[in-house]
UniProtKB/Swiss-Prot annotation:
InterPro entries: AcCoA_carboxyl_beta, Acetyl_CoA_COase_Trfase_b_su, ClpP/crotonase-like_dom_sf, COA_CT_N
Domain called CoA carboxyltransferase N-terminal: residue spans: 25-294
Pathway(s) per entry: Lipid metabolism; malonyl-CoA biosynthesis; malonyl-CoA from acetyl-CoA: step 1/1
Annotated source species: Bartonella henselae (strain ATCC 49882 / DSM 28221 / CCUG 30454 / Houston 1)
Catalytic activity: N(6)-carboxybiotinyl-L-lysyl-[protein] + acetyl-CoA = N(6)-biotinyl-L-lysyl-[protein] + malonyl-CoA
Assembly notes: Acetyl-CoA carboxylase is a heterohexamer composed of biotin carboxyl carrier protein (AccB), biotin carboxylase (AccC) and two subunits each of ACCase subunit alpha (AccA) and ACCase subunit beta (AccD).
Source organism, top-level taxon: Bacteria
Protein name: Acetyl-coenzyme A carboxylase carboxyl transferase subunit beta
Keyword set includes Metal-binding: no
Ranges of Low complexity composition bias in the record: 287-296
HAMAP family referenced in this protein's UniProt entry, alphabetically: AcetylCoA_CT_beta
Sequence similarity: Belongs to the AccD/PCCB family.
The gene coding this protein: accD
Length: 306
């Protein structure tokens, strides 16, 4: 046995050898190809600094950036029956759920919490697209209803961030039932005369668009978000016509009166806080910590004048 071969060489190789580098250290901007360091992106709420492109953001990160000082109290989601239909396609549905829960550390795609934004108490509900495409199922339906019930009980407004591909096909009719159930919860909030603001993020489609995502008092969209019922490719194949440029984008919907405003994620908190002060008749803040963009200020000034 040669001690150089068995001992020295492995030591040298361990020091000089190639080390595994995590794949997610640098994030590529889909629009420009620019590489952005993941820590810089996280600090900037996953908005590319140079282009303003809005990357997808996890529900936990969104709540942390949205609430004052990142402090909030999560609402416990109700427990539901798992996979009552015993659904299976290429993989058992129950196994898919286990995989997503293990990977993301959440039970389903809805996270709700109570906290404050610029001192205003609110309930916020966020859909996480990373969990089965943000699909609406029994668990997410129950979680949304729980958030509305909590807002009513605590007499505070509710802000919902939608991100979904639609109803969860693995739950069939049980998934579709969540559309009218969440609609009833919204009506109860409105009867209590409490504001309901929806923030449409990329993408918001399918049954979610056909229910709670388009029933808010005010609809705000993030820049470049795709919002619609069916996807543009399906529509184009059905009507056999070329769709307008930018069809179903948040900017297109704003231009055609489908939503109220398009606001950068970086200005979302300040914009929503100002809207809630108008709607709840709270006194204005003289010097808010964040400033809104010129477009947002103009839109809100019109609302105040009205």
């Amino acid at each position: 046995m040669n001690w150089i071969t068995n001992y020295v060489r492995p030591k040298i190789n361990s020091i000089l050898g190639r080390r595994e580098i995590p794949e997610n250290l640098w994030i590529k901007d889909p629009t420009s190809g620019e590489m952005v360091f993941h820590k810089d992106l996280e600090v900037n709420q996953y908005v590319i600094p140079s282009s303003g492109y809005h990357m997808r953001i996890s529900a936990k990160n969104r709540l942390t950036h949205f609430f004052d000082d990142g402090v909030y109290t999560p609402l416990e989601n109700p427990k539901v029956v798992i996979d009552p239909l015993k659904f299976r396609d290429e993989k058992r549905y129950i196994d898919r759920l286990k995989d997503y829960r293990s990977k993301l550390g959440i039970d389903d795609n809805i996270l709700s919490a109570r906290g404050t934004i610029e001192g205003l108490p609110i309930i916020a509900t966020v859909q996480d697209f990373a969990f089965m495409g943000g699909s609406l199922g029994m668990a997410s339906g129950e979680a949304i209803i729980k958030a509305f019930d909590t807002a009513i009980a605590e007499k505070c407004p509710l802000v919902l961030f939608s991100a979904s591909g639609g109803a969860r096909m693995q739950e069939g009719t049980l998934s579709l039932m969540q559309m009218p159930r969440t609609t009833v919860a919204i009506e109860m909030l409105k009867e209590a005369k409490l504001p309901y603001i929806v923030v449409l993020t990329n993408p918001t489609t399918g049954g979610v668009t056909a229910s709670y995502a388009m029933l808010g008092d005010i609809h705000i969209a993030e820049p470049g978000a795709m919002i619609g019922f069916a996807g543009p490719r399906v529509i184009q194949q059905t009507i056999r016509e070329t769709l307008p440029e930018g069809f179903q984008s948040s900017e297109y919907l704003l231009k055609h009166g489908m939503i109220d405003m398009v606001v950068s994620r970086l200005e979302m908190k300040t914009t929503i806080a100002r809207l809630l002060r108008l709607m709840m008749k709270y006194p204005p803040v003289v010097n808010p910590s964040n400033t809104s963009s010129t477009n947002s200020q103009a839109s809100l000034s019109k609302a105040e004048a009205a």
